[in-house]
């Protein structure tokens, strides 16, 4: 059973750089947690991203309804909802068999709702690594005594 899950923000990087990072980390499934899966960058709009991932042999799953941000009452409150728990269970089920990367638009995970998703997955026994770029990852200090905050 694989117990590792990555996260990555699309940010302002291009699709080629995004896919290079995905491939460098041997990611098999991209789980899109954008509640509104659109972008100023055409290649990151849901339909185009889905097609591009499939072309590259990467599975694409959208879980924005369950795990997307921008929630009334705040995202922390949303983490207690049945929909959130359902989304987390779906991610966990996929991650038991494949290398998964949770994606959103925000580059920096500490400014994104991916940090709450990662925190929950951590309590379920998963190691969560937030990818910043090709050379840097981030794990909150209080979530890992074995890994530096930046690598």
Task: Please give the residue ranges for each predicted region.
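Residues lining hydrophobic/aromatic ligand-binding pockets adjacent to catalytic sites
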Residues: 1-151
């Amino acid at each position: 059973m694989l117990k590792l899950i990555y996260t990555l923000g699309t940010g302002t990087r291009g699709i080629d750089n995004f896919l290079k990072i995905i491939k460098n980390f041997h990611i098999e499934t991209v789980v899109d947690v954008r509640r509104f899966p659109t972008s100023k960058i055409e290649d990151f709009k849901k339909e185009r991203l889905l097609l591009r991932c499939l072309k590259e042999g990467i599975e694409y799953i959208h879980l924005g309804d369950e795990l997307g941000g921008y929630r009334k009452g705040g995202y922390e409150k949303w983490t207690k909802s049945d929909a959130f728990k359902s989304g987390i269970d779906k991610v966990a089920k996929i991650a038991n068999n494949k290398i998964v990367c949770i994606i959103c638009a925000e580059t920096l995970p500490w400014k994104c709702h991916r940090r709450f998703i990662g925190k929950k997955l951590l309590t379920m026994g998963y190691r969560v690594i937030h990818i910043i770029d090709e050379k840097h990852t981030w794990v909150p200090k209080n979530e890992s005594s074995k890994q530096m905050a930046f690598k």
